Amino acid sequence: MEKWVIAAKRADFNQIGQQFHIDPVIARLIRNRDVIGEDKIREYLSGTVQELPSPWLMKDMEKAVDILEKKISQKAKVRIIGDYDIDGVTSTYILMKGLARIGADVDTYIPDRVADGYGIHAHLIERAETDRIDTIVTCDNGIAAAAEIQMAKDKGMTVIITDHHEVPYREEKGERQMVLPPADAILNPKQYDCPYPNKNLCGAVVAFKYIAALYERFGVPAEELEDYYELAAIATVGDVMDLQGENRILVKEGLCRLKNTKNQGLQELIRANSLEDAKITAYHIGFVLGPCINASGRLDTAARSLALLNAKTKEEAARLAGDLTALNQSRKALTEKGKEEAIRIIEATELKNDRVLVVYLPDCHESLAGIIAGRIREKYHRPAFVLTGGETSAKGSGRSIESYSMYEELVKCADLMIQFGGHPMAAGLSIEEKNIEEFRRRLNVNCMLTDEELRPKIVIDVPMPVSYITKELVEQISLLEPFGKGNTKPVFAQKNLRVLDHSIIGKNKNVVKLKLLDPQGISVEGIYFGEAEDFVNFIREKDSISVTYYPEINRFRGRESLQIIIQNYC
C-alpha cells in the first residue's frame, strides 16, 4: 500500500511569488525541489547556457587539451571508443564531429554489446595497435578499465578518458582511496579532487565540455557549439541524470533547438515517430526518441544509431530512422515477455520474500536486462537485478530505489563478479553462473533497507482544490519544465471528489474519462491512464474518492478546457 505524504518545506511563498511574479503555488513547487535563495531561484526560472561553469574547471582539462593539440599538430591517428547506449552514441558523435572540426585524424569504434561487451577490452587495444592508432579517447567508459589502459600504455599509446561513472575505490583505514587507471588524462567530475561543481553530468556532457575547451584553444567560434546542445539534452534525459542546475539548463536549451534541428537523422527520427507537429518534451526523449536510439545497441549494432546522426541525405536518414523505430517496437515486445517471465519466477519462488531481487533469465536478450530490472523495481519497489545467459558467463543490470546505493553494495560483493560498474541508482555486471545464488544471498544479507524504505511513497507537492486551477496557473507550471528525475512533474491532491460520470475510452480500453465534482460544487473533467477496469470497479464502490493529479489545458478542435490527469487514487 502506498503512503501519501505532503512535502512540508517552508518558505515565504507569497514574498517569493511577488519578487519573481509567480503564483505562490509555483513558489512552493520550486521550494519543494530544494531550489533555495534568490540566485538559485532566478537560475531555475531563467538560467541560460552562457552562465554554465567553464570546462576548464574540470580536473585534467588543461592536460587533455594540451595532449590533443600536440597530437593534431603531429597528424597522429586518434580513435574514439564509445559505448552502445544513448549516452555512449551521442558522446561518440560529439567527440567525432568536434575533433574532426579542429583537424584531427579521427575514427570511432562503438563496442558491440554481445561480441565486445561494455567498455575497453584487450582485443580492442590489440585492434588499435594493428590499425596504428596513436591515441585513444574514451567516452562514457574507461574509468574502471585500469588493466586495459595499462595494456595500451605498454604498447606506447596515449589514452584520454572521458567518463562519468563512479570512480573505483578501495577502503583503507576507513577512508576511500580512488583507484584510477593509468591514463594520460582523465576527465570525470566524480574524481574526488575534481573542482567541477556538477558531479552529475552524463558522458555526453563531459565530451561536450572537452570539445568546448578544444574549440576555445583552436579559436573555433563559440556559436558552433550550439549544435551540440540538443545532443547533450538527449543524453542527459536518456541516461536519466538529475534535471537540476546545469543539467536542467542544458536540457531546456536542447529541447528548444531539437524542434528545429539541422541534424537530418534527428529530423527523420522525429518524423518517423509522428512528432513533427508536437512540442517535444523530456518525455518524448525518455520514452519515444531515446528508446529508438538505444534500440540499435540493444538488438543490433549501435553503429546504426551513430550512422543516423551522421546521415548526409534525407533518404539515408529516413531509412535509418524507420529501421530504428521498427527495432524499438521489437524491443518493446521482447521486454514485455521478459518482464512477465521475471514476475512469474518471483511469485513462484522464495524470491518474493527478498529485499533485493536477483532474477536469472538465461534465455533473455542481455540488452533488455536493464529495462526489465527497471520494470521489476517499479512493480515491487525494491532494488532489482536481472541477469541473462552468455557464452562464458551471465551478464546483467540492476536498477535501484533512492535508499539503496547499488554501486556501493556491489563493491561489497566484488569477489563474486568478473566485472561491474555503475551508479547509486543503476549498475551493470558480469558473473559466473555458479556464483549467482551466492550473489543473491549476500546482497540480501548485507541489505539494511527497512520496511518503511521499501514502502512506496507518493509525495504530494500541494493539497489543492481543483477550484483553484486556472489557465494562468497551468501556464506558469510550464516554467518548471523540463520534468524528469530530480525535477519531477508536480503532484497535487484533493480529497472527497464525487464521480458524476465515467467512461472507458481508447483503442486499448486503458483510459477512463470522468466528470468530477468537488465539495464546493465545482466540476472538472478528469482523465486516468492505466488499469481502467480496476479504477472503474473502485469508483463504483465509493461515494467519493481522493486523488493525486496534474492539471493541464485540453485543446480540442479549437476549444480549450481545464482537466486533471489522475495519477493515484484511494
Regions found by a protein language model. Give the residues of each.
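Mid-to-C-terminal polyanion-binding domains and interfaces
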Residues: 70-74, 316-360, 412-570
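Active-site cavity-forming subdomains of large catalytic enzyme subunits
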Residues: 126-204, 208-217, 227, 244
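A short acidic, amphipathic alpha-helical/loop segment
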Residues: 147-151, 357, 372, 476
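Histidine-centered active-site/metal-ligand motif
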Residues: 164-165, 365, 423, 511
